[in-house]
């Protein structure tokens, strides 16, 4: 795998997100990522700070273009806790948990995010408006109801499958309800 290929795959996905125009300023965007899967290895076996760095940089460009708030999911060893900026935890009254993600417990991506955010904290859970799962890390528990899968053309980042989702409000009221557009 070359860093150029990885960056190109990510740029394609970032472009698809921005072209879709579904992300709004201040939306929470959850990212689950196995850098091992990106490298073509089984999840949890070959975490890579270099891969995490490239992914983080490209996601920052998505953040800059859309105004979203990034949230990074840790691995199952930290119960899929979430790394966010302290301002997000405070704004949404998210209780902080006592853990610092590292490559071996939390995962390389969450550890990298924790090391490079301005004032990071780890929270137990979050309810995001959208998200991206790189390498089948199971982000569904952190998405608002109702999750709507997005079918982007770019389906892989190197070897890792990518799944993207947005959310929509529940439709309530039954057959008499009017939902507009």
Swiss-Prot record:
Gene3D superfamilies with a match to the protein in the record: Hypothetical protein TT1679
Cited InterPro entries: Antibiotic_NAT-like, DUF436
Superkingdom of origin organism: Bacteria
Stored Pfam families: DUF436
Similarity comment: family membership: Belongs to the UPF0340 family.
NCBIfam families: TIGR01440 family protein
Protein name: UPF0340 protein OB2986
């Amino acid at each position: 795998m070359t860093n150029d290929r990885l960056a190109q795959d990510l740029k394609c996905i970032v472009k698809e997100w921005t072209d879709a125009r579904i992300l709004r300023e201040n939306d929470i965007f959850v990212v689950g990522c196995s850098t091992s899967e990106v490298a073509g290895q089984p999840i949890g076996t070959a975490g890579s700070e270099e891969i995490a760095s490239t992914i983080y940089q490209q996601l920052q460009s998505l953040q800059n273009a859309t105004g979203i708030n990034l949230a990074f999911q840790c691995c199952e060893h930290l119960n899929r806790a979430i790394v966010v900026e302290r301002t997000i935890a405070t704004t949404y009254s998210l209780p902080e948990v006592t853990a610092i993600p590292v490559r071996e417990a939390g995962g390389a991506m969450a550890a990298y995010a924790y090391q490079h955010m301005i004032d990071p904290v780890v929270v137990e859970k979050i309810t995001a408006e959208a998200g991206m799962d790189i390498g089948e890390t199971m982000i569904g528990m952190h998405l608002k109801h109702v999750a709507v899968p997005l079918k982007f053309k770019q389906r892989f980042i190197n070897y890792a499958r990518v799944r993207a989702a947005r959310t929509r409000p529940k439709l309530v009221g039954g057959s008499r309800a009017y939902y507009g557009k």
